[in-house]
């Protein structure tokens, strides 16, 4: 049994790379930016909707190795999806040529299957094949892990993506093609001592962020963990009691559903509610479609408070206003994701940077505590 610590590195996001290459406007024009379609899934189909635009602002990445000897890949550890996939040598899309590509012929432990994988994005689909191989993650060997080898990847914009692939950490029920997720396979093999993993995201430093499989490291948080039951086992979905600013309800007055998603960088919610919040904090759209705010307002704005399972989780303006190159932008994003349990909110990295998060599969609960 070992504790598996995977360091995450904070790098420039896809959005920042697009801006620096003068490609953001073209991207926004050609990719109707629908963050929500990652979460809209027909349970009956095996096609999962997961637009890559969701990963536009993601900044935290980890390295895994696949095969024997290991071939290294930079991936997003994403609690909002469940598949592992990386580019393969069978992919000649422009995006693949600029990234590490898995070569099955170079691995002595690779096992092919005849199964295919298709993950639909907002603008096309990532199609590929499923294979089995050993995945090296945080110093342990996850053997016989099923994963996707991409053959086509949508959109040349992925050429600029700072990651090769995605490692999904949500429940098996939302895995495309019914593929066993990495954490499930690791737990089933008895490679970690507890059926849980935890995440710490550092605010500023490039290093320091970490995903820990099978353990809770109390040095990352202060006080004690508060536990919240998972309301629907698919995403890491929980019930939020209320969302307030200055003691006034600004959204979710009758309770709402939220998912805790490391693969989404912002705080997202229904467009009407979010536009109320944007006007409340004085944020507005500039000519390029960015929602900007005066940097001087960071000192005067109130916390936004999420009450979850009776406990208040304040997120201060220094967290929900993002500063980059002297420009301040809102960390709130509107999207409409209606589910049978109502409209979904997404507590992304803006929230997780404030709260050390434990994803407890064994007890179907999430633990939250302020970061140390």
From Swiss-Prot:
Instruction: Tell me the domain of life.
Output: Eukaryota
Q: What is its EC number?
A: 3.4.23.1
* Positions of the catalytic residues: 78, 261
**Record keyword 4Fe-4S present:** no
GO MF terms on file?
aspartic-type endopeptidase activity
- Could you tell me which cysteines form disulfide bridges? 91-96, 252-256, 295-328
Please list the residue ranges annotated as the Peptidase A1 domain. 60-369
The alphabetized list of GO BP terms reads: digestion; proteolysis
Subcellular compartments: Secreted
Give the Phosphoserine positions (modified residues): 114
Extract one GO cellular component term from the record.
Answer: extracellular region
Q: Which UniProt keywords apply?
A: Aspartyl protease, Digestion, Disulfide bond, Hydrolase, Phosphoprotein, Protease, Secreted, Zymogen
InterPro entries registered for this protein in UniProt: Aspartic_peptidase_A1, Aspartic_peptidase_AS, Aspartic_peptidase_N, Pepsin_A, PEPTIDASE_A1, Peptidase_aspartic_dom_sf
Is Membrane set as a keyword in this record? Answer: no
What is stated as this protein's family in its record? Belongs to the peptidase A1 family.
Query: In its UniProt entry, what is this protein called?
Result: Pepsin A
Organism of derivation = Bos taurus (Bovine)
């Amino acid at each position: 049994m070992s504790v598996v610590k995977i360091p995450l590195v904070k790098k420039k996001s896809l959005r920042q790379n697009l801006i620096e290459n003068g490609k953001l406007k073209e991207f926004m024009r050609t990719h109707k930016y629908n963050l929500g379609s990652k979460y809209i899934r027909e349970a009956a189909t095996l096609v999962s909707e997961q637009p890559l635009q969701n990963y536009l602002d993601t900044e935290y990445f980890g390295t895994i190795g696949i095969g024997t000897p290991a071939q290294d890949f930079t991936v997003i550890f994403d609690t909002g999806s469940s598949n592992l996939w990386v580019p393969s040598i069978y992919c000649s899309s422009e995006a693949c040529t600029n990234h590490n590509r898995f070569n099955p012929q170079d691995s002595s432990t690779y096992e092919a299957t005849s199964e295919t994988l298709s993950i639909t994005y907002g603008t096309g689909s990532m199609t590929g094949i499923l294979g089995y191989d050993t995945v090296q993650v945080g110093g342990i060997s996850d053997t016989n892990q099923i994963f996707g080898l991409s053959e086509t990847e949508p959109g040349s914009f992925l050429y600029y993506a700072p990651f090769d692939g995605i490692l999904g950490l949500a429940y098996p029920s939302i895995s495309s093609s019914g593929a066993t997720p990495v954490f499930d396979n690791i737990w089933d093999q008895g490679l970690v001592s507890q059926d849980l993993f935890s995440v710490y995201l550092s605010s500023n430093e490039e290093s320091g962020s970490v995903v820990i499989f099978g353990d809770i490291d109390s040095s990352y948080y202060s006080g004690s963990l508060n536990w919240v039951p998972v309301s629907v086992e698919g995403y890491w979905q929980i019930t939020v009691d209320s969302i307030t600013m200055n003691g006034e309800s600004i959204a979710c007055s009758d309770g709402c559903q939220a998912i805790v998603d490391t693969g989404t960088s912002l705080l997202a919610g229904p467009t009407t509610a979010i536009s109320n919040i944007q006007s409340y904090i004085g944020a507005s759209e500039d000519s390029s479609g960015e929602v900007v705010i005066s940097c001087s307002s960071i000192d005067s704005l109130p916390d936004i408070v999420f009450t979850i399972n009776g406990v208040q989780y304040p997120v201060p303006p220094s967290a929900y206003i993002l500063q980059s190159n002297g420009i301040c932008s809102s960390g709130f994003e509107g999207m409409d994701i209606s589910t049978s349990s109502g409209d979904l909110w997404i507590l992304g990295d803006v929230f997780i940077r404030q709260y050390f998060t434990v994803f407890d599969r064994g007890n179907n609960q999430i633990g939250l505590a302020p970061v140390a």
